[in-house]
UniProtKB/Swiss-Prot annotation:
This is Cytochrome P450 3A12. Transmembrane segments: none annotated. Heme binds at C442. Its EC number is 1.14.14.1.
Length: 503
């Protein structure tokens, strides 16, 4: 029996041509970096170098940095990506040529109306969003929001007290995750939730569904490798952000906005109210003001960008304090001197705390919120003698940069003194990028820092943290997407003086 089908010569020829064309399509871009003399791993047809992500993005970046030096090229599917670590090149990409060449981030895939969110919008639409939203994050507005965050600092202390009284070790992600969710949902949607004690609340459930996001999920990976599938997914009504979840938040914002517009009394200052105010400002041209759907998109992206990052950063920081008790004690001494007798923190005093700033900065060096920064090259350009073709994604491997031993002696060590007044002036600002930099840096950076500092002060006024038998030492990272600990960070929590000052 013949194992080879009996096709005509024309059919075989057509099949051969189709296979050749398919191969050429899957490899067409893969010679770009070789022609430019830029080193990097060897790509495979269609998948490029994406199989190198098996152990995580940042493990891949560290290996490439070690093997190829300060610049290398690789391929996410057919997409050429140029990794740069030279501070001058980074400055050019993120600052100098931001508006002209490197304005946009890579397109994520089928995102629907979320395309108007400030993190995902492009070119003139992004500039418009940034202009509209920047006043929301001024010092004055953050001061007005400070009491809202403060009340959840009290909830955090009370929740920790209940757990500490049980005498059991505490999973930090549970308590800091609840704090982060409470603050974000309160400031973005105007709702008050004690999420740790009300896990069935619709806002809690939908926020957690929104954040079930894995960069190595087959759906996301298929978009990464085959971006041309995006229109197909849109036709099939398949979205990166779950439609049921975005519909829930859209209806919630519409309901909240309607309620606030009906009630003429003065409302508290939060992101939702500030965005509503911008819609109704007489100084704002109608075509420039936020539409209702754009307002919803910003509220959702605040949750997406702020929840996981804040809770994870706080967990990492507490781990470092628990394993460096001398640093923890020194920070508590600064807190006690700044706010005697467990006085409630104030915004102005918080921003003046030098050692608190040092500890937070060093934590964000070791565990940067954004392990990678990306910009798409809009036209052919030459930077520092390197030609970058149009369509190339230029990537700054922040995690790798922050652990470069030529910049940070003994980079794996936790040393807040790196950021002392004496030392921080010697740090090149383009080698320390936990929130990015330039016109398209994280718009919520100052809010996130304030949020974390307030939580740290309230917690350390009342508790000390110590390792226990469940604590993983040394800490191992799960680098699939956002940097996370491989296992939950579990610590023993002890009241400092036997009494806890809560709400």
């Amino acid at each position: 029996m013949d194992l080879i089908p009996s096709f005509s010569t024309e059919t075989w020829l057509l099949l051969a041509i189709s296979l050749v064309l398919l191969y050429l399509y899957g490899t067409y871009t893969h010679g770009i970096f070789r022609k430019l003399g830029i080193p990097g791993p060897t790509p495979l047809p269609f998948v490029g170098t994406a199989l190198g992500y098996r152990n995580g993005f940042y493990v891949f970046d560290m290996k490439c940095f070690s093997k190829y030096g300060r610049m290398w090229g690789f391929y996410d599917g057919r997409q050429p990506v140029l990794a740069i670590t030279d501070p001058d090149m980074i400055k050019t990409v993120l600052v100098k040529e931001c508006y002209s060449v490197f304005t946009n981030r890579r397109t994520l895939g089928p995102v629907g109306f979320m395309k108007s969110a400030i993190s995902l919008s492009e070119d003139e639409e992004w500039k418009r969003m940034r202009t509209l939203l920047s006043p929301t994050f001024t010092t004055g507005k953050l001061k007005e929001m400070f009491p809202i965050i403060g009340q959840y600092g009290d909830v955090l202390v009370n929740n920790l007290r209940k757990e500490a009284e049980k005498g059991k070790a505490i999973n930090l992600k549970d308590v800091f995750g609840a704090y982060s969710m409470d603050v974000i949902t309160s400031t973005s949607f105007g709702v008050n939730i004690d999420s740790l004690n009300h896990p069935q609340d619709p806002f809690v459930e939908n926020t957690k569904k929104l954040l079930k996001f894995d960069f190595l999920d087959p759906f996301f990976f298929s978009i990464l490798l085959f971006p041309f599938l995006t229109p197909v997914f849109e036709i099939l009504n398949i979205w990166l952000f779950p439609k049921k979840v975005t519909d829930f938040f859209r209806k919630s914002v519409e309901r909240m906005k309607e309620s606030r517009l009906k009630d003429k009394q003065k409302h508290r200052v939060d992101f939702l109210q500030l965005m509503i105010n911008s819609q109704n400002s007489k100084e704002m041209d109608t075509h420039k003001a936020l539409s209702d759907l754009e307002l919803v998109a910003q509220s959702i992206i605040f949750i997406f960008a702020g929840y996981e990052t804040t809770s994870t950063s706080l967990s990492f920081l507490m781990y470092e304090l628990a394993t460096h008790p001398d640093v923890q004690q020194k920070l508590q001494e600064e807190i006690d001197a700044t706010f005697p007798n467990k006085a409630l923190p104030t915004y102005d005093a918080l921003v003046q705390m030098e050692y608190l700033d040092m500890v937070l900065n060093e934590t964000l060096r070791l565990y940067p919120i954004a392990g990678r920064l990306e910009r798409v090259c809009k036209k052919d350009v030459e930077i520092s003698g390197v030609f970058i073709p149009k369509g190339t994604v230029v990537m700054v491997p922040t995690f790798t940069l922050h652990r470069d031993q030529s910049l940070w002696p003994e980079p794996e060590e936790f040393r807040p003194e790196r950021f002392s007044r004496k030392n921080k002036d010697s740090i090149n600002p383009y080698t320390y990028l936990p929130f990015g930099t330039g016109p398209r840096n994280c718009i919520g950076m100052r809010f996130a820092i304030m949020n974390m500092k307030l939580a740290l002060v309230r917690v350390l006024q009342n508790f000390s943290f110590k390792p226990c038998k469940e604590t993983q030492i040394p800490l191992k990272l799960n680098a699939q997407g956002i940097i996370q600990p491989e296992k939950p960070i579990v610590l023993k929590v002890e009241p400092r003086d036997g009494s806890v000052n809560g709400a």
